[in-house]
Amino acid sequence: MAARLLFRRSSQILRSIQRNPQISSSFESPPCPIFHSLTTASPDPSRLSSLTFLRSLSIARRGPTRPKKIDIGAKARQMQNRRLWTYALTFSCIAGFVVIVLNQFQDQLVFYLTPSDAMEKFAENPTKNKFRLGGLVLEGSVAQPAASQEMEFVITDLITDILVRYKGSLPDLFREGHSVVVEGFIKPYTDEVRKEVSTKPISKKARNLDCFFSATEVLAKHDEKYMPQEVAAAIEKNKKIIEAAATEQAAEVAAS
């Protein structure tokens, strides 16, 4: 402690002497040997070494500065949190993209349905009105209005009949009583369309519906292999239902 105070005092005196050299001449008594050794202008190596020694002694008493400890656990937790947030954001983006793609695909997806199934789905959700209808062309239902380019015919699954209007030429293999697949939209009857339908020889079932099918494409073949399996199975099921009902009715008539 004494050495530090001595060093500070000597430094102050040295600075004051360097600023005003005339101060040294005002002292009547000769300066202290230590001060004389510090204030001399001669660059004596021994005196410089003593000054360096005092300065190093002052620094040594302060003690070495210890470096701050690095918390490895905190850094590891921070990196782990960053990874978790990165994974979460990446997964959210991927999930959102998949949902958007599936919704778009669902909107563009078109199912093969019978007229009965199509009318049931349209009643549940009128906004989803695009279908592929499969069934049989009802005999005697094909007609072309004189003042229109639209062809009209009725598709049936033996339970439900629906009027189809198609603008364009029908395929060469299109025949009454044969299978057909049409793609288009279910639309409600307008007053004009209903007035036209009332004067045409279409089935009573098709006339009693509140909507018709506006076809954008018609596909036809003579064999039943062209018909989708689900539609063919539904028609076969309806045949059995009709046959069973006819047999039951005949039995009731015979019993009476």
UniProtKB/Swiss-Prot annotation:
Transmembrane regions: 84-106
GO molecular function: heme binding; metal ion binding
Superkingdom: Eukaryota
Signal peptide per UniProt: none
Cellular localisation: Mitochondrion inner membrane; Mitochondrion intermembrane space
InterPro entries associated with the record: CcmE, CcmE-like_sf, NA-bd_OB-fold
GO cellular component: mitochondrial inner membrane; mitochondrial intermembrane space; plasma membrane
Transit peptide: 1-57
GO BP term, example: cytochrome complex assembly
Keywords in alphabetical order: Cytochrome c-type biogenesis, Heme, Iron, Membrane, Metal-binding, Mitochondrion, Mitochondrion inner membrane, Transit peptide, Transmembrane, Transmembrane helix
Binding residue positions for heme: H222, Y226
UniProt membrane topology term: Single-pass membrane protein
Predominant location category: mitochondrion
UniProt cross-references to PANTHER family, sorted A to Z: CYTOCHROME C-TYPE BIOGENESIS PROTEIN CCME HOMOLOG, MITOCHONDRIAL (PTHR34128:SF2)
Function: Heme-binding chaperone that may be involved in cytochrome c maturation in mitochondria.
Family statement drawn from the similarity comment of this UniProt entry: Belongs to the CcmE/CycJ family.
Full protein name: Cytochrome c-type biogenesis protein CcmE homolog, mitochondrial
Species for this entry: Arabidopsis thaliana
Gene designation per UniProt: CCME
